[in-house]
UniProtKB/Swiss-Prot annotation:
Alphabetized Pfam families for the sequence: EPSP_synthase (PF00275)
Binding sites annotated in the UniProt record for UDP-N-acetyl-alpha-D-glucosamine: 93, 306, 328
Keyword annotations: Cell cycle, Cell division, Cell shape, Cell wall biogenesis/degradation, Cytoplasm, Peptidoglycan synthesis, Pyruvate, Transferase
Reaction(s) catalysed by this chain's protein: phosphoenolpyruvate + UDP-N-acetyl-alpha-D-glucosamine = UDP-N-acetyl-3-O-(1-carboxyvinyl)-alpha-D-glucosamine + phosphate
GO BP terms: cell division; cell wall organization; peptidoglycan biosynthetic process; regulation of cell shape; UDP-N-acetylgalactosamine biosynthetic process
Gene Ontology terms: cellular component: cytoplasm
HAMAP family documented for this protein: MurA
Record-given protein name: UDP-N-acetylglucosamine 1-carboxyvinyltransferase
Function, in words: Cell wall formation. Adds enolpyruvyl to UDP-N-acetylglucosamine.
GO molecular function terms listed in the Swiss-Prot or TrEMBL record: UDP-N-acetylglucosamine 1-carboxyvinyltransferase activity
Source species: Magnetococcus marinus (strain ATCC BAA-1437 / JCM 17883 / MC-1)
Gene3D superfamilies: Enolpyruvate transferase domain
UniProt-listed Enzyme Commission number(s): 2.5.1.7
Amino acid sequence: MDKILVRGGNTLKGTIPISGAKNACLPELAATLLTEDTVTLRNVPHLRDVTTMLELLGQHGAAITIDEKLGVSIDCKSIQNTMAPYDLVRTMRASVLVMGPLVARCGHAEISLPGGCAIGSRPINLHLRGLEMMGAHVTLEDGYVRIKAGRLKGAHIVFDLVTVTGTENLLMAATLADGITILDNAAAEPEVVDLANLLMAMGAKIDGAGTRTITIEGVKNLHGTSHDILPDRIETGTFMVAAAVTGGDITMTGTYPALLEAHIAKMREAGCQIDEMDRAIRVRAEAGTLRAVDITTLPHPGFPTDLQAQMMVLLTVAKGAAQIKETIFENRFMHVSELQRMGADITVQGNTAIVRGVPQLRGAPVMATDLRASASLVLAGLCAEGETLISRVYHIDRGYERIEEKLKALGADIQRLGR
């Protein structure tokens, strides 16, 4: 199993291109199941989770062509089966996103209960209740969710909690339903908007994406199209923190400041200089000048939970004490014990972490527990004194494209070690 070795202390400087967003790519790959025509997605990130989703589509019967320019063309004319098996779903929770498209187009689906990051229960009951309201019959047998339906019917669905994948699943299902579907308390994340843009390019009738109320008028068929996946705001935010904690100067290209308004505001409050351009963000920071800032994770447009662990690293070396309140997922402080091994002063009380800045972290052997936690440990290694050896880095490959190569290009002393 691969490990990553980081020797800290280098100041990172330079320009880095941002990859396509994993959290937009995965639902958009699933959306190709909705049509018999070919859909081409561009700016597809080369990630383990994307490979898993392509394998899942392939076993459903999709014909997949990949070009040399990060483009993927998917032809789902012939869906051979509607089962998402345990061996694929267990590795990636986003596999559940094929559920809505399969039920909408084929009238049935069998989905293994999902896996992915171990950051709380993240139940799919909100997805299932919505499908039931649209006329589907749902049963749970032998670890599989079995769903059967005729043509789905439009419904008024109010989410008890804001759910990104739940919004995406029901948004996709509703595009082929009979009648009008209203999703209230829907997720407003940029990735949901990007999915809606793809679906509308395929012929769907959608209004309100990016707000808390989305209205979908079902159509009988969707058609093929081409679509550019939006840039990854979480990768962007991660490299922004890398600039801050190393006292560096990094420009991220191919990304949009509007995707990260809450994160940019907090980094400015913490003492970073940030230049916003049309398709780029530049972050500069002086060593020893970072200030403590309180953070509460919230649904978009609030501070994203997927950048909580990275900002915690910044706060470990900032002046003063700060509070991080995690309101989205339970068990999302599993990186704290590893940061403490590196000398961080962090106390966890329920869903709140109190972070008191220290002059410097120290390198240590640490273990990644989930995707974003693994990124935080790399960031900690970059600003720590000495060597940090990070185990179980397969987590990071699920969401970051060639992270060690990109960091090395900016001046980091980092390398991947084989078994």
